[in-house]
């Protein structure tokens, strides 16, 4: 399907609720309002309540997180019986891998190498250079053995490589420009700092070839940080965070509610993405917003489109190595999440959107306030310690210890399941997972909530510069 970026933008404007602005139905207003008003009431109870119930905001926070763990536990139960990821038979769909790069010269060659060396390489590799000012052009000249194309033009080597050179306009616009040159049935987005394992593309092909209604799929990623003290600590915490998060995605996939697809390594059916207008340049998390648009369009037209997470499609992706970069990343992620939840608020609680509307998006409505609940609970706990409120600290401490025990149990079980799911291709182990479960509530989790709260500030002030 040949298409221009102008036509993509026209389709985006005609489909996205950011422009169509549907009315917000009463269920959505009630769900979002309940989450916010409940926080106000629970926080007020800290000054009016007695005994352990003065810490009601913390109790609700613990109960909500435990409920999500229980949901994931139940839905991921079948993973204990996974033995392998069977290869599909029959015709294989054609695939273009799109690498978007902005000043990624040090890592770009390794990313391309990993694609070229796949057990089943993509039919085309399209490097979309978003106006890099570093040595990216030199790297690509050496790799493609071609002079740099003019801005807005594409150079093609005699191999599978294509080089699209664009003026700097952001990842989403560069991706949309690349889509106009894709000639295959599928395209896969790969960040320039993401290294795919050898069978990753094959696993993507398997999934799409066996399921004609699969519109998008995410691979399973492992975070890799720099070799510094802060990098090693953050990699430890983020590794187990990623394990839990990808298992959670599997759980939501099981109830047809998966919305979170990692653009660092994701596969899409080209016709579906072009139909809904490509990626939105005005969203901070263009991959996440895209999935909402795909699911909405599919439900509205009874197309049966759905999404998946693939345990056989594995990759390693660069993750923040310093607290500052980590907080900025989480600020962008959460700010973009709030943008998307706001734009698609008419789907919240709407039965016509199936489990996405009835379950997933109401949970996401609660998630908008989860970091605020968490930080409120922690600040109150500090206040009890400073003021010597022993009568509160003892029962609250018991609740926290009980939650840690639950987390320990879930962490151990999740490592067992995750290893089965990815075929043993992981370095995570039980000992470090248990240690992370003990330390995380008083360290890494607080930084996650701080970054998310910063995202709230950015969302409310409509900041787009990151």
Regions found by a protein language model. Give the residues of each.
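Short aromatic/hydrophobic "clamp" motif used to bind/position activated sugar donors
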Residues: 187
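Acidic donor-binding segment of Leloir-type glycosyltransferases
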Residues: 113-167
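Active-site donor/metal-binding and catalytic loop motifs
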Residues: 305-325
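Membrane-embedded multi-pass helical conduit in multi-pass membrane proteins
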Residues: 42-79, 87-89, 364-460
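Long helical/loop segments within the catalytic core of UDP-sugar-dependent glycosyltransferases
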Residues: 149-163, 167, 172-180, 184, ...
